[in-house]
Amino acid sequence: MGDTVVAPAPLKPASESTPGPPGNNGGSLLSVITEGVGELSVIDPEVAQKACQEVLQKVKLSHGGVASSDRGTPLELVNGDGVDGEIRCLDDPPTGIREEDDETEATVASGTAKGARRRRQNNSAKQSWLLRLFESKLFDISMAISYLYNSKEPGVQAYIGNRLFCFRNEDVDFYLPQLLNMYVHMDEDVGDAIKPYIVHRCRQSVDFSLQCALLLGAYSSDMHISTQRHSRGTKLRRLILSDELKPAHRKRELPSLSPAPDTGLSPSKRTHQRSKSDATASISLSSSLKRTASNPKVESEDEELSSSTESIDNSFSSPVRLAPEREFIKSLMAIGKRLATLPTKEQKTQRLISELSLLNHKLPARVWLPTAGFDHHVVRVPHTQAVVLNSKDKAPYLIYVEVLECENFDTTSVPARIPENRIRSTRSVENLPECGISHEQRAGSFSTVPNYDNDDEAWSVDDIGELQVELPEMHTNSCDNISQFSVDSITSQESKEPVFIAAGDIRRRLSEQLAHTPTAFKRDPEDPSAVALKEPWQEKVRRIREGSPYGHLPNWRLLSVIVKCGDDLRQELLAFQVLKQLQSIWEQERVPLWIKPYKILVISADSGMIEPVVNAVSIHQVKKQSQLSLLDYFLQEHGSYTTEAFLSAQRNFVQSCAGYCLVCYLLQVKDRHNGNILLDAEGHIIHIDFGFILSSSPRNLGFETSAFKLTTEFVDVMGGLDGDMFNYYKMLMLQGLIAARKHMDKVVQIVEIMQQGSQLPCFHGSSTIRNLKERFHMSMTEEQLQLLVEQMVDGSMRSITTKLYDGFQYLTNGIM
């Protein structure tokens, strides 16, 4: 027929008993849908009922009409305004030349009428089931995203868009890349359903606004996007970056970007005037670097950066609340681009230190690290602690950031700058200004922000040497991706409950600790990051806090971040989402696999920030520094085979190795050399750098053919092929794969939605999603899965391509 109605994927034919999420392989949902159906404060039940009616009527006609046609020819609704419309075949010959007799016609007519009544009854039940599913506790954010993506009906899409308001912010935030990618690349009905929620959240949170603006810019940058779709994403981005989405009270408080005299300003206005000064930090910094640059290429890049900055600011007219942060991010990105032009690691390190020392002159400011999970202001960047990371062609670098936590970023005043010399003369807490995290306390302490831009004494050499930068890993002990090492060092408190330990256990543990103190790495000019990364995080925090003028404050936090330029982190963000989903699945199914997803901030199509994994160094650095095998290094770090520390580290190694082997198999992760596999202080391995996943491989050679990387050194740490821990490893692999395939749809939809309109290399080829689904082996029995795991483990352990690739990396990049 003409415009055939395509039913949403979740809806089943009339013969099936339940509506479920698309691709759902589970059992009936009706037994639980009838229980605990909650009322939704945001959803209008009449609107929902009408939307479901529209969808299900069309589904009924589509399914029922085809079923009633014996000849399989297209059907047409003659009276297309309702359920009782006449259905006929488009290809029927004229009445005058029909060969059927009257009796046959009567029989067909009678059957059609009865079929229509049955279909009305069935679809009425379906309609009730679908609405009850939407309103039930089973309807989580994952199911909502699936229906939003698969449904072709504007009514259902609008309903789901309204339903987003009922989910927790953090649950929706996880799927923000999918929502914005659908907005940019799918039809207008989907965009219209999503936009109200995005606008509402942007009014509530400046950090959410920044995340949306960055992602919209990145996802709109693909060359194949049509002019109409590109302009749609750009229009929403401009709206987010404008004053239109500011809450009304903030519009009244925040001044314009034009300079204003200090006289007559209220304390809050003085604070925002300071923020305006901060917003020009990178412009001032760029001009200073031009005057001192000795490299003509660097000078040219600075001019391009300045021109680009002016163009962006003029184009989007950034409000005060986002302008300082955008300039702060641009400054960090510009540093990375300039470092990439220098030939040696030593020159890059020196340049990085000098660049950050200049940046420090604009702090504290109304800026934050977007990778953090709490409100805060950046106060210092310890430039001498920054290091350049290993990279052949680019210059990613790691910085540490000192921040002060606050209750609300928008309403809390920017902290006053505390000069270093004042701290040294009056070190006691009693003589320092109190600076709590409450709004009232902070308003009293920081109501007036002095301008130290021209104060030479305030910015002495000693001051610059102690600075630090913020990060998201140390704040909370919740189940986010923030590093627990940071949490332990900053927020933990000694338990007041008495703990009784046998004296013999105390003596034994003390002797083990004294005999097996973790080793320190030697400084290597070719790899300066090794020493910084090997230092225990708690020691680093203590050392930096003691030397900081802000360290006495109870809301002081230390964070860290990796800044990358020239790399597209959209694939990294996709991998992070899949890892988080698998981590949640294994926790839900109580499978003791261990993986550590780390946060990714996509800034543009070729730049971003990464949350570092603290207390961890690469296996390459371990082997280069220690000149030991992996097993011998474990014995050196954790003690002999029978010690509690070694057994705990060995178990951690097995659980993390099994987890990442499954990740590498499902996502087809490549480029698995020892520089991309970390080993932390507790024995876990952590895979990093997911630049080659799914359909992409280094240089598109497809050289690594094994399911995952499992070397003989890994097996030795597990106790050998006949060891109990090796059998435990294979058992975890099987349990993890069984658990993952139970929730395959949750994993696949993350990847499938991001493929829409994407030019990422991981989506090259038409079979990416089909191959991903096949790796879950839905048709296999558990016995067949066990055999498959045995074959994958054996093949990976004996893979000649893994050994050849490690040798290739050693010869070309020196990676051991």
From Swiss-Prot:
SMART domains: PI3Kc (SM00146). Its main location: membrane. Residues 668-676 are annotated as: Catalytic loop. Inhibited by wortmannin. Increased kinase activity upon interaction with NCS1/FREQ. Residues 49-242 form the PIK helical domain. Residues 541-547 are annotated as: G-loop. Belongs to the PI3/PI4-kinase family. Type III PI4K subfamily. One of its GO terms (biological process) is phosphatidylinositol phosphate biosynthetic process. Residues 2-68 are annotated as: Interaction with ACBD3. CDD domains: PI4KB_NTD, PI4Kc_III_beta. The modification N-acetylglycine is found at residue 2. The modification Phosphothreonine is found at residues 263, 517, 519. Residues 1-28, 93-120, 249-318 are annotated as: Disordered. It is an enzyme of class 2 (transferase). It comes from Rhinolophus ferrumequinum. This is Phosphatidylinositol 4-kinase beta. GO terms for cellular component: Golgi membrane; mitochondrial outer membrane; rough endoplasmic reticulum membrane. It catalyses: a 1,2-diacyl-sn-glycero-3-phospho-(1D-myo-inositol) + ATP = a 1,2-diacyl-sn-glycero-3-phospho-(1D-myo-inositol 4-phosphate) + ADP + H(+).
